[in-house]
Each structure stands twice: as structure tokens, then as C-alpha cells.
Amino acid sequence: ITLNLHPADGVAAYEENYTEMAKDMGVDPETKKTIPWVNSDKKFIRSMFKNILGPMEKDGVDFWWLDWQQGMFDPKMKNLSNTWWINYAFFSDMEKRRETRPMLYHRWGGLGNHRYQVGFSGDAVISWKSLDFQPYFNSTASNVLYGYWSHDLGGHIGSQIDPEMYTRWLQFGALSPIMRTHSQKGAKLNKEPWVFNKEYCDIIRETIRQRYVMAPYIYTMARKGYDDGISLCRPMYYDYPENKEAYEFRNEYMFGDDVLVMPVTAPVENDYAQVRVWLPEGEWYEWHTGALLKGNQIVERSFAVDEYPIYIKAGAILPMYLDNVMNLNGNDEEVAVT
């Protein structure tokens, strides 16, 4: 469970335990004065964790989404980046007080900040152009060690959801480090599978199911990334630096050591999307058909809405859950090795 915070709003009088925090900060609670957020103030940060956030964590909040609306720098300490420091402060507090590994969801705070938060890339516009940019954005972030971007799959800002676009966005998200959806509040912006017609509902459910099934592989590669510093999602030139195609196919990426992905980021024409995929040396199995293809070639083929370009390196071993897995929390389900 996570809750969204807007820390820059400070601590207002209507918040639970405001009185205790106001006293800590030398503010008369009767004034109902909002206590401003100051990252560099140790007294403020300690009181906030003790009086405001700590009780909610005891009630079941696992981690915080810091939807920060701040200025760039702290008002009292020169050149202290608000984003960088709040990520550090929250992560360090969890590290000290909890027995579990810290988890934080927030924006990029600059070089070195990859140590702390899972990334929130901001309120994406609902458009094919936004979708087309994200695979490149996702993979190249590994160049600054930032392997955990997450996106508002399907877009956030707009008037309504395009079912095809949303489906393609989810397919990309299922083979990204973090898979989540989010949007503005609106009657035409709901993203639950059942709000779409049966065709799209079935495809969306199958896409989510694929993510569940691949969880053991994703976790294995995430752990390897933690140990080695090589991101789960990375550009092709990491593995094939001598090939010019590794730089030319900007949206193509490796998802772990053995899975090659080329997201579909444009609408279909006559029920199919035409996609060009570069297959590096070796042999590759096409996920949806099982066809074995030789590498060192560019493949162009049509993909229906329920298909997208995923290729598995021949000889790879992929640990996966069985197709009936329903819960990834504390899971001790059987694992199939493919």
C-alpha cells in the first residue's frame, strides 16, 4: 500500500497529529498555522516522521509516493537540492526504522540519486508520441545507473483513453522494470480491463498475466542488476556495442540478459502494425509464435494488437510462474524453467 504526498504543501492544521507537531516546532496549535516544509531542518524532519507519517505506516502504509511540487533548492541551505535531499531523507529513515528493505517512489533527483527512489516520470500526455518516447527514455536512463523508471501507462493528461494505445502502452509496461497505471480523474479515463470491450479486455488481462508469469525472471534480473550495476532494462549497445544497428534501433532494448523487446508505438493499419526489429547474432525465438529465427538480420513483420515483438535468446533459461498464479506477495508457487 502506498499513499501520495505533496510535501511542499507543508503540514496543515487539518492533518492528524498536527497539534503534536506544532508543539515540537514551537507553533501555537490554536493559530492553525501551516508548518512549512523545510528539508534541511532536522527538527522538522524528525517530528514529521514521528508524528505524521510514522502512525500511518503502523496502520499499513508500505511506502510513500512523494508527488513533490517544490522549488529546486531548499529555502535555508544554499544549493541543497530539494528533490535529492528528500529522497535521501525518506530512504534513510526507512533504513533505520524498518526491518524490510526501504522503498520510495519519487522523481529523479540528479546524478547519484538512483540509490534511493523508484522513478516517477511525471504526468504524461495521452498520445502516441508520448508512448513512442518512453522505451528510449527508459533504457538510456541506465547510462546514469537509473534502472527503475516507472510511467503513467496509458498516459495521464487527456480527455479519454484510446483502447489500442492503452493496450500497446501496457504491453511496453509489462516488459519494463515497473508496471503501473495512473491518470487524471475522469469518467473516460478509467483503465480497469473490464471498462473496455471484450477484445481489448482479454488482451489487457493477458498482458497483465504475462507480467505475473515472468515475475521470477524479472526478479532474478533485478537482483543481478543490484549486484552488478547493469540495469534490468538497457539499450542494445550494452550487449552489442560493435553493431551500428544497436544505436540505430533506439526503441529496441534488452530486458535482462535474455529477452529482446521492441515495443509497438504506432497505431495499426488494416488491423496490423508493421514493425522492423534488429536481431543480433545468434538465434532467437519469437515469443508469440515460437518460431526460431537466425540473428544478424533485420526482420519486418506485421503484428496484430494481441502481439508485439518479444524475442528470447536461444539457449536461455527463463524461470517463470505457471499461468494460474494470482498473487506475487510472499509467493511460494511452483516455478517453471523454460
Can you say where each PLM-predicted feature lies in the sequence?
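Catalytic-domain carbohydrate-binding cleft regions of carbohydrate-active enzymes
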Residues: I1-A314
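Accessory, solvent-exposed terminal regions and/or long lumenal/extracellular loops of proteins
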Residues: E307-T338
